[in-house]
Amino acid sequence: MQERADSRTLEMIKQLLSKARINTKRWAEELGTVLIVADQKSIETANGQFALCMAINMLSRLHPVLTHIGVSIPDPAVFSVNVPLFTGNKILDAILDFINKLKLDCKVERVDLIHRGWDAVLSIGPSNLAIENTISIASDGWIAYVAADGLATVFTKNTNPIGAYAAACIGGMEVFKKVFLKKSNLLLPEKTPFDIRWRLKFIKGRLSFSAFDYRVNGSPANNPSLPLTINGRDLTIAGVGAGGGATAYSLASLHDLEGRMTLIDPDEVKPSNMNRYVYALQRDSVSNRPKVEAVKELLSDFKKLDVQACQNSYQELTASREIGNIDVLISTVDTKETRRNMQWDMPRVILDAAVVLTDFYVRRVDIGKSPCLICTHSPKEVERPLEEILSEVTGLSASEIAKLRSTNACLVQEHINRMTKSSEKYGFTLPSVGERFSDWLMMHCGELVLSATQERFPLPFATVLPGILIAGEVIKERCFPKDVLQNYYSYDMINLPANGMTEMKPVSDCIFCSSLATKERFAKKYG
């Protein structure tokens, strides 16, 4: 089966509705419409420009839930900041150019005459539209504002892409939920017990969320301004998919960034990545461009930032050279094993993020102060190895599968020949020659009918927002070290934002962080 830009969105719909199959043609044919509007004052601020572009970037990728997006903004509006991928001086022209380069199935067009027929409206700044399902957003520095009944604030000149992007994600998620609910009720009115519609909650009234201290409706006092130049010093991002890519995109939106950044990811951009990779355009997926190269280009305007792009898995990279001191490591990788390997390499700080369907977390690891990645991702001895289960179904040996997964290798004709008989027996789609085993498994785990794989197709907003928050943690680590995450935050995005962070303690019997030898080695390494 050919991979499409909406492949993962369709799989996500199945999981949200707890359905083995959906009528993909009907989902594409049934309209799902969103109007994005902005007033003159909001669009003149840098924060308003950040929020508008992130909203366009995210929502236009969500076909077939969204089929049409209208954009109504003042025509003379011009950029006062650099927003990655949105090039040119005039904002409307830059948006239309971005959509042309994205080339996805959701139709995005300028709207001059506003009618009441939209399923939902996202207003960048205050709105006086009398249209049902209108969500308004604004930001002030680190603080995002989202309202269902009219904003009590506006975009301020306290420029900060983190707060603006958080507002766009939370507000964008609200309009997405409204359109998703409308279409799913129309196309699949009967709900299973595990249908996500039982748990959907919408913002009522007004809500603020601080990307600085993770408070909901808290005091706006804790909201420091960003310096013009931020020294990232030595930063490593392992995994530049949706989360790590959103971190890099957010950092690329700063006024100036200097230091050294290492990007690690073995994969190329694929069509199915397009629903959640905010840095990717069609040219990247068509050319199978390495993810690290696409992300590196985002950061090319920073003259004092040295970016190293490593198209390797973390295991391959660390096996090929000695790992010295890693100052700050951002972990947005897919497997527990890789996270444990990262922890054994003993970075000074790890910023870890992950998502399961609609629920994400961000975590900071400080040895001796918080749970380490071995505490939180310890292997369960009772679990049957996934490779054994896959071997029984695919016809490949467990050792072959382990190697294919660990090296991110491509399948050859000989693999496919041996999988053919199993495909006929179990009814799964055979991979293509040259396709990565991990990519094929991700796309067809449902056909394998393996409850043990528990593969999930996450909600795009739930992959991007943690990446934005991790970028905020990088900024705080360098500029506001007394205010870093202590040490865990989670948010289920089909619900309302959770209020505040949770401080967790290390596991008392952890073989790594509770070891005196580990603490002595860490102290010797970092003084």
PLM segments and residue spans:
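Glycine/serine-rich phosphate-binding loop and adjoining beta1-alpha1 elements at the start
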Residues: M1-A51, I56-L62, G88-D234
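Phosphate-binding loop/pocket of nucleotide- and phosphate-handling active sites
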Residues: M1-E44, P64, S184-T247, L254, ...
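N-terminal Rossmann-fold NAD(P) dinucleotide-binding loop
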Residues: L52, G244-A248, K270
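Glycine-rich phosphate-binding loop and adjoining beta1-alpha1-beta2 segment
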Residues: H63-D105, R260-K304
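Conserved SAM/SAH-binding loop
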Residues: R110-D112, C310-A319
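A short, aliphatic-rich alpha-helical micro-motif
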Residues: H115, E322-G324
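ADP-ribose/adenylate-binding Rossmann-like module
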Residues: D119-V146, V328-C372
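Adenosine-phosphate binding glycine-rich loop
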Residues: D149-P193, R197-R199, T358, G368-Y489
